[in-house]
Swiss-Prot record:
Broadest EC class assigned to this enzyme: lyase
Molecular function terms from GO: iron ion binding; S-ribosylhomocysteine lyase activity
Subunit relationships: Homodimer.
HAMAP family recorded: LuxS
Cofactor binding description: Binds 1 Fe cation per subunit.
Protein name per Swiss-Prot or TrEMBL: S-ribosylhomocysteine lyase
Origin superkingdom: Bacteria
Named cofactor requirement(s): Fe cation
A single GO BP: quorum sensing
Record Pfam families: LuxS (PF02664)
Enzyme Commission number(s) of this protein: 4.4.1.21
Gene (name only): luxS
Residues that coordinate or bind Fe cation: H54, H58, C128
């Protein structure tokens, strides 16, 4: 099985909350695609609660589009990581980490403005696979924690696992 890019970085040295360019590539027509690691929690030390991350998934994707999409950027998808320590964001364009961090912080402010669980988008059995597994309170706690800590930057060069270490794992 090929080694995926996300497993070539040292998770024991990741900071959170932090933005990291996880991958860059081009479409067959030459358009740039960037995948960002939006790390909410320090790996193997913290984990996002399932109801909170699910609610955040419904809110975060729209709010990030409000703050980041423009003439040079279009978000394709934002999805939670299986390890529940953050989200992956795939987009067309090459915004720098500072721009993504600012959009992320603004999106967290927007999450805090949602005060009624009934206002969570797509919160129904027709549009959500587990529509009863939500917690606006947990989403608010996550947003407050991000804003309290501020969003930093993780750099691949600083997190790269040496080839001898990768070979031994």
């Amino acid at each position: 099985m090929p080694l995926l890019d996300s497993f070539t970085v040292d998770h024991t040295r990741m900071q959170a909350p932090a933005v990291r360019v996880a991958k860059q590539m081009r479409t067959p027509h030459g358009d740039p695609i960037t995948v960002f690691d939006l790390r909410f929690c320090v790996p193997n030390q913290e984990i996002l609660p399932e109801r909170g991350i699910h609610t955040l998934e419904h809110l975060f994707a729209g709010f990030m589009r409000d703050h980041l999409n423009g003439s040079d950027v279009e978000i394709i998808d934002i999805s939670p990581m299986g390890c529940r320590t953050g989200f992956y964001m795939c987009l067309i364009g090459t915004p720098d980490e500072a721009r993504v961090a600012a959009a992320w912080s603004a999106a967290m402010e927007d999450v805090l403005k949602v005060v009624d669980q009934a206002k969570i988008p797509e919160l129904n059995e027709y549009q959500c696979g587990t529509y009863q597994m939500h917690s606006l309170e947990e989403a608010h706690e996550i947003a407050r924690a991000i804003l309290a800590h501020g969003v930093g930057v993780n750099k691949n060069a600083e997190l790269a696992l040496p080839s001898d270490k990768l070979a031994s794992l």
